[in-house]
Amino acid sequence: MSKIQTLRGMNDIHPKQVKEWSYVEEVIKSVVESYGYEEIRFPVVEKTELYTRSNEAADIVTKEMYTFSDKSGESISLRPEGTAGCVRAAIDNDLLRTDKPRLWYSGPMFRYERPQKGRSRQFHQFSAEVFGLSSPEIDAELIMISARLWKKLGIFEGLRLEINNLGDEQTRKSYSKALVDFLTKFSKELDEEAIRKLTENPLRILDSKSPAIQEILKDAPLIEDFTNQDSKNYQANLLEILDEMGIGYKVNPRLVRGLDYYNQTVFEWKTDLLGSQDTLLGGGRYDDLVEELGGKPCPAIGFSIGLERLILLLNQEDKIKLETNLDIYFICFSESTAQEAIICAEKLKDKIPSLSIKTNLGLESAGSQFKKADKSGAKIALLCLLYTSDAADEGLG
């Protein structure tokens, strides 16, 4: 029979890779929790309405969601991103009424898009979200968390931070109209995708990967010419904090995020080492989303890290240094010695519970087992012998 393979764009993570993933996830978790953030968990499947209500015109909703009807006929979707689900969970569990929670979560997301280096149909994110705070200080905290993380992983010097301010709703409406008026003059040069974005959410055209469209946009109006004084002051205060902390940045007036709910601060950490998939972390404010999803008005901000891309970069730069946690490797040459070895291993763990012990029960040749013991990285390899006919037959009696 033919073997069954994984779905295209959905990848297995084998044991050696899991060690790398666990290392990276633990580093991120330790940094985030050192700032008082707490873990939250919520389902990977939600009502489709959760995503259509929060991102009606976004590509992930119009083209990329895994959506189907369950047996009751209700439309449900695999989560394409985590923020909407986190907001829903915070509202459902009444986390926002008396507190200003700082939360983190990690797990798989799903988007039906063309698989390529650094981009899969099932991918993983580590995210942090903050609710109830509307000052530039909390925006700065999230950026400082990410900067500290990059330093701990040894890649800070190779990354660049880009920041923009999308203003309030009126700013985005005025700017969108100006953008449409400008781009309409180039309608014959716009591709089908650009025309769709121009109709549904003009700001999204700024994120186009088309060189021809980016050339046109060089002369397009900038959103900073439409933001009000409050937004300008907000961004100035944020940048002042980053200057004080020595975190370099570039203000990119064309930076937008791929989801519709962002306002005011948006930011990305990028690298030049991964080709077109250059964004490692993206985040921003979404002050209207809680109310849009049925909660009371509540400011919020968050970021997400693409774990596949981060681990790809760390391996490329040889920044993952794994140490084995195996203390003892038992080598056995017969069923009798194997039995004695597993009993001995259990007694050792009874005495010292923290011991990590692996027993080879394959009964391979001596050479093969010694090679495996060496490859395991164990601190000690123990040869388990009994004077039996089996051992004598092996020439070890």
Annotate each language-model stretch with its function.
Residues 387-397:
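Single conserved hydrophobic/aromatic residue that forms the stacking wall/gate
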Residues 1-389:
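TRNA-recognition modules of translation machinery and tRNA-sensing kinases, especially anticodon-binding
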